[in-house]
Regions:
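Active-site anion-handling motifs in enzyme catalytic cores
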Residues: 1-362
Length: 362
């Protein structure tokens, strides 16, 4: 770690979830592309015995793709304020950093930042329409958010929530994985150990249920191709993998995958069925024929927002308990309009970030 950084980033960039890893890396690369020095603030709290920080593929990812000097040590909550001596500004985001129950004791609202520091939010998500903020914490959270000089959020409903609840203005920008350049993604894909030869239907189901299983089997039968089930990135939770394999016993499991295999699995798939937000995002990015199952456990509103802005709500099943078999879902997708919207959203996100670095301090 160096003595000085332009920006310290607080987020879930270190997590074993594939989407979190790619989201955080996109933010790192994007901010650095503006010529800024970046410190990625590691998972706060005590890392002792934390399997996510000792045995996951994410540990290898951080070592491989980040400059080690750009990664902080683990600070306990009561020492995060020491980062003020190293960072001129702080950035929260992206992903569900403002979903209160997973905000690391409110530290994703950057309460440790000193007055006079520039505070930015880069595509932060509340996860749900109200961020699950309890009534007793609402006023305190509002006081933290009003300190930000520039706020962008990932979903339009978050923009409305900030205005209605706190009187705070924000802009909605696209999920950061859409900002990754094609060369970076291609290099990761080429490093994958997973190299499929035959067409396959990819399943990326984070929360398997019997109703999802039965619906998926109908699509597998109709497509007449083998199914591959990509397991969750949290390999330190073997019971989760076991349940996924049992629920999808008609599919070949792809486990112990890193982000390279995750990307390759989506890139090469002939068809995708997923209940993951980032699974949906990469299906769009890679021009897949896909079916997205809204996931209320992880914030169904996020799916509606992303697919609505990119003009692809026709690929969304909103109710995971009612998944129809419809041959229209099997048809190829014309991505011309979706790509136009993605280009527009990318330009907007980059323009917002450029303005945010120049915005007056609150």
């Amino acid at each position: 770690m160096r003595e000085h950084y332009d920006v310290g980033v607080a987020g879930f960039w270190f997590g074993a979830n594939y989407g979190s890893l790619m989201n955080g890396y996109a933010i790192y690369r994007t901010i650095k592309s503006f010529g800024k020095s970046v410190l990625m603030i590691h998972k706060p709290g005590d890392p002792t015995g934390d399997p996510e920080l000792t045995q996951g593929h994410n540990v290898d990812f951080v070592r491989k793709y980040y400059d080690p000097e750009d990664v902080s040590p683990h600070y306990p909550y009561d020492r995060l304020h020491e980062l003020n001596d190293r960072c001129d500004a702080f950035c929260a985001g992206s992903d569900q950093v403002w979903n209160y129950p997973i905000s690391f004791d409110e530290n994703m609202y950057l309460p440790f930042a000193e007055e006079g520091k520039r505070l930015l939010s880069f595509a932060s998500s509340f996860g749900t329409a109200d961020g699950n903020i309890p009534a007793e914490a609402s006023e305190r959270v509002g006081s933290y958010l009003r300190r930000f000089s520039a706020i962008s959020v990932r979903e339009k409903f978050a923009e409305r929530f900030l205005a209605d609840r706190y009187g705070i203005s924000a802009e909605t920008i696209i999920e950061p994985v859409f900002l990754l350049d094609e060369e970076t993604i291609d290099q990761m894909i080429s490093a994958s150990r997973f190299r499929p030869r035959d067409p396959y239907l990819l399943l990326y189901i984070l929360d398997p249920t019997e109703k999802k299983r039965e619906a998926i089997k109908r699509y597998v039968k109709a497509l007449k191709m083998r199914a591959v089930t990509l397991l969750d990135g949290k390999h330190y939770l073997p019971d989760n993998d076991k349940r996924n394999i049992e629920m999808h016993d008609f599919a070949v499991p792809l486990g112990q995958a890193g982000c390279e295999e995750f990307l390759r699995a989506f890139h090469d798939a002939a068809f995708v069925i997923t209940d993951s937000f980032h699974g949906t995002a990469f299906s769009l990015l890679f021009h897949k024929s896909f079916l997205s199952i809204g996931n209320p456990i992880r914030g169904r509103e996020r799916f509606l927002d992303l697919l609505g802005r990119l003009g692809r709500t026709d690929r969304l099943i909103e109710d995971p308990d009612e998944i129809p078999f419809d041959r229209r879902f099997l048809a190829p997708i014309n991505y011309d309009e979706t790509d136009r919207r993605i280009r527009q959203e990318r330009a907007h996100a980059m323009a917002w970030l450029r303005r945010a670095f120049d915005a007056p301090l609150s």
